[in-house]
Amino acid sequence: MPSGCRCLNLVCLLCILGATSQPARADDCSSHCDLAHGCCAPDGSCRCDPGWEGLHCERCVRMPGCQHGTCHQPWQCICHSGWAGKFCDKDEHICTSQSPCQNGGQCVYDGGGEYHCVCLPGFHGRGCERKAGPCEQAGFPCRNGGQCQDNQGFALNFTCRCLAGFMGAHCEVNVDDCLMRPCANGATCIDGINRFSCLCPEGFAGRFCTINLDDCASRPCQRGARCRDRVHDFDCLCPSGYGGKTCELVLPAPEPASVGTPQMPTSAVVVPATGPAPHSAGAGLLRISVKEVVRRQESGLGESSLVALVVFGSLTAALVLATVLLTLRAWRRGICPTGPCCYPAPHYAPARQDQECQVSMLPAGFPLSPDLPPEPGKTTAL
């Protein structure tokens, strides 16, 4: 080993690495360094082994957390007088020095720094700090994890501090999280503990079932048709000549009909095709408009209208016929509906019997016959 370093174990290997061939100095650290717990470095300093500390490596390192103790070897915690415990943090005289028991409780030392309190009736707790108040008397009635509060027993009544999702005097009621109807589009709300979930109908998704699933995402339409999304459905806007749900059908081309001999159902309406008029018979094309058929059928009289028209016509005809019959009957009896209609007796006969009654359709005073002009005030008109 070089003379410039004295190492006693592998911990001082650094001394070897830093050693030189120079002779030892007069102020060699071996005279004051505890070589049992360290070694001398080339610079004359004392390098301590692990677990030792101090200028000369004379002091052991205590256990971490040791409060009222010392050590003889590294990582020890030897308690001083009056202290106990693994970390020497327990006061053996706690019952006399600190009086930890409250409300008249008696402190009893158990050794090793431990103690317990003998509480007076009506009090409890490690230090007799709690009174047997409403919570204890009621048997701690708060449910579902609720905390009973009574100001450590000194309150007149207790209160329950409920966890989220519960309510009531004893936290016994589960709050209905579906009360505000958070689920949309007819979804079913399932209540939980401080939460809810939505059971979405087909075609919707999301936490609140507000997302309409795109039924066109799979591109169901064929023939290059445009897809229009709906609620749990879709429509295909097929190009001309194609049909079906996904435009999978090829529609037959319509055959033009002749003007002379049109072949069509009796309920169809034939509409001349737009464009210039044909120059010869049979050269024009006809177009069958289904919309026009429906429109004309809708604009016709319904069954109820026809029945009302027949009834009204029958009543009118019966009224006219009754009027005519009554008029003829009165005429045959020589009675006008509005009064006498014959000339006075002095012109034709001494009485009204067997006289010919002439009914005038002219205003009063107009001559009824060129041979017999009426006398003033003698003609009676209907």
From Swiss-Prot:
- Segments spanning the bilayer are 306-326
Task: Provide the function of this protein.
Answer: Regulates adipogenesis.
Q: Give the bilayer topology.
A: Single-pass type I membrane protein
Per UniProt, the keywords (alphabetical) are: Calcium, Disulfide bond, EGF-like domain, Glycoprotein, Membrane, Repeat, Signal, Transmembrane, Transmembrane helix
Instruction: Name one cellular component (GO) term.
Output: membrane
SMART domains xref list: EGF (SM00181), EGF_CA (SM00179)
- Enumerate the Cytoplasmic topological stretches: 327-382
Q: Which InterPro entries does the UniProt entry name for this protein?
A: EGF-like_Ca-bd_dom, EGF-like_CS, EGF-like_dom, EGF-type_Asp/Asn_hydroxyl_site, EGF_Ca-bd_CS, Notch_Cell-Fate_Det
Q: Which residues lie on this side of the membrane: Extracellular?
A: 27-305
* Cellular location(s): Membrane
Residues annotated as glycosylated are 157
Span of domain EGF-like: 27-58, 62-89, 91-129, 131-172, 174-210, 212-248
* Name of encoding gene: Dlk2
Residues making up the signal peptide according to the UniProt record: 1-26
Cystine pairs annotated here are 29-40, 33-46, 48-57, 66-71, 79-88, 95-107, 101-117, 119-128, 135-148, 142-160, 162-171, 178-189, 183-198, 200-209, 216-227, 221-236, 238-247
Q: Which GO terms describe its biological process?
A: negative regulation of Notch signaling pathway; regulation of fat cell differentiation
Name it.
Answer: Protein delta homolog 2
Q: Name the tissues where it is expressed.
A: Detected in a number of tissues including lung, brain, adrenal gland, testis, adult liver, placenta, ovary and thymus. Not detected in fetal liver or in adult spleen, muscle and heart.
Q: Which Pfam families match?
A: EGF, EGF_DL_JAG, hEGF
Gene Ontology molecular function: any one: identical protein binding
